[in-house]
């Protein structure tokens, strides 16, 4: 399975080449494939904030490379680079407040600096750590894909119709995706007959990104309006909803793309199983429940400005980017560390704190 998945990999969104971070600008997809070259931390933070790069894992990876660029700048300035670098940590942390992987990556980079030995080259050490973060995410994608497809096979042995929402694919990770990784594996194994993708307003990650990724790989995909998804579950024989996560609280509540919560409610009503696929770095045990997850809200212009012209004036806009799906609506959370069915505080604590002999 691993070799087949790697052979099928066609889309990548993050490259570290020649001492610069190259990001596929996801704001322009699918009409234009343009790469942004970031050679300083301000450009990386802007790319994260403005959603040129998006997806929790991808944001964390980009931030790690952003710190490498920041350190290079600080060393060239010749001042107190350790003190100055704190400003860069803060700049990156503030770019997208909901993505748990962002803070995990920044903390891991900070810990690497604290372990620095006197004889080590600080820039080389930090660059190696960023590369390791990138590579570990790719490996996590592979593991999650294999675990997720085993769950789907166990539930029903024949080819199935799956529904996904948002974009939790190669564009949102360092590999070939979390939710879409499971879907890709399922298609290769003959377990997925068709994928339905919700458009995912207002940024249209489903129609612009997920449908584009799946079509590029020849996976049968049907695009649906967000308002049609409950009807879809009722009429099209959907067996699983498979989504990613931006942050998972200690009790199993999941923050994901706005609209995921209502999708989970519909899935529960229609007897459709609900799977969340996310690396363990998305789990924050310091957040007791979903109520503690900071939920980003974006500018009203994303709803009021269409094609450069105002659609309506003098109205207020509520534009949250994420919502929280309660743990009791989730059948299973798939991570690279293992699978948690019917998640709760005890099960997630056991997953994260599990002692390993090897």
UniProtKB/Swiss-Prot annotation:
Q: Show the active-site residues.
A: 246 (proton donor)
The annotated pathway is:
Amino-acid biosynthesis; L-methionine biosynthesis via salvage pathway; L-methionine from S-methyl-5-thio-alpha-D-ribose 1-phosphate: step 1/6
Pfam families per UniProt: IF-2B
Binding of substrate, residues: 54-56, 96, 205, 256-257
Q: Give UniProt keywords alphabetically.
A: Amino-acid biosynthesis, Isomerase, Methionine biosynthesis
EC number assigned by the record: 5.3.1.23
Q: Which SUPFAM superfamilies match?
A: NagB/RpiA/CoA transferase-like (SSF100950)
Catalytic activity of the protein: 5-(methylsulfanyl)-alpha-D-ribose 1-phosphate = 5-(methylsulfanyl)-D-ribulose 1-phosphate
Query: What terms describe the molecular function in GO for this protein?
Result: S-methyl-5-thioribose-1-phosphate isomerase activity
Q: NCBIfam families attached here?
A: eIF-2B_rel, PRK05720.1, salvage_mtnA
Q: Which family does it belong to?
A: Belongs to the eIF-2B alpha/beta/delta subunits family. MtnA subfamily.
* Job description of the protein: Catalyzes the interconversion of methylthioribose-1-phosphate (MTR-1-P) into methylthioribulose-1-phosphate (MTRu-1-P).
Q: What is this protein called?
A: Methylthioribose-1-phosphate isomerase
Q: What is the organism of origin for this protein?
A: Pseudomonas putida (strain ATCC 700007 / DSM 6899 / JCM 31910 / BCRC 17059 / LMG 24140 / F1)
